[in-house]
Amino acid sequence: MNKRAAIQRAKIKMKILLSNDDGVYAQGIHALADALRDLAEIVIVAPDRNRSGASNSLTLEHPLRVSQIAENTYSVQGTPTDCVHFALNELMKDALPDLVLSGINHGANLGDDVLYSGTVAAAMEGHFLGVQSIAFSLAGTTHFASAAHFVRQLVEQHLANPIPTNRLLNVNIPDRPLELIQGIEVTRLGARHHAESMIKQKDPRGHDIYWLGPPGKEQDAGPGTDFHAIERGWVSLTPLQVDLTAHESLRSMDHWLKEKVNG
């Protein structure tokens, strides 16, 4: 079966859940939906407002309020993780989607950004709950059409030849016109320096208030990293795993514990 036939066959039953952390009205999620409507049934479940930086947080102290604002489009008073959790465990529990896609984020999620990112967290929740998931981020706020092109390319490739891993994928697209993007590279996460200092100001009543400083500059941004790909005009595709265990340290830590505590 050729690629076109495989895509046409998959379209008959394909269903995709979309979420994000920029909010249900954000430009990125609608660019994502528009790029895929003729490929699949699209369901949008996203926060009612911007929840950037929410990471994997869940709402535990009050109920989630959900509003249907259009056909197959739902606004949730909660975090990105809440949205995907609600969608897969309630809204779509009797017919789970084939893919969970998060984004298109308004700004890159590179290196250790992924630890804070609500965009990545929404995809991670889909992964936790057993659905192939991909997070998409645009390294800026202008060329959403370029990002949508690569979203569609990757989804079509998945339809014709399913992604050969059960890992979560983190995809970043340069904020450039399509003709200036070189292609797609598989990368690893880079790393930043520590974030800059807090910014102290006064509120109108003279009380001290504090803003988080901007993210740190790139520290590990050499060849093979997601930072390096984006800087050179390539789309970065990074497979992520949920297991945070430092496996290479297990033996040395076991030795240290026995030597210092038990010996």
UniProtKB/Swiss-Prot annotation:
Keywords: Cytoplasm, Hydrolase, Metal-binding, Nucleotide-binding
Catalysed reaction equations from the record: a ribonucleoside 5'-phosphate + H2O = a ribonucleoside + phosphate
Record function comment: Nucleotidase that shows phosphatase activity on nucleoside 5'-monophosphates.
Protein name: 5'-nucleotidase SurE
Binding-site residues, a divalent metal cation: 21-22, 52, 105
Main location: cytoplasm
Pfam families per the UniProt record, alphabetical: SurE (PF01975)
UniProt record similarity statement: Belongs to the SurE nucleotidase family.
Source species: Vibrio cholerae serotype O1 (strain ATCC 39541 / Classical Ogawa 395 / O395)
GO annotation, cellular component aspect: cytoplasm
Record text on cofactor binding: Binds 1 divalent metal cation per subunit.
Cellular compartment(s): Cytoplasm
EC number(s) reported in the record: 3.1.3.5
Gene3D superfamilies, A to Z: Survival protein SurE-like phosphatase/nucleotidase
InterPro entries: SurE, SurE-like_Pase/nucleotidase, SurE-like_sf
Example GO molecular function: 5'-nucleotidase activity
Required cofactor names: a divalent metal cation
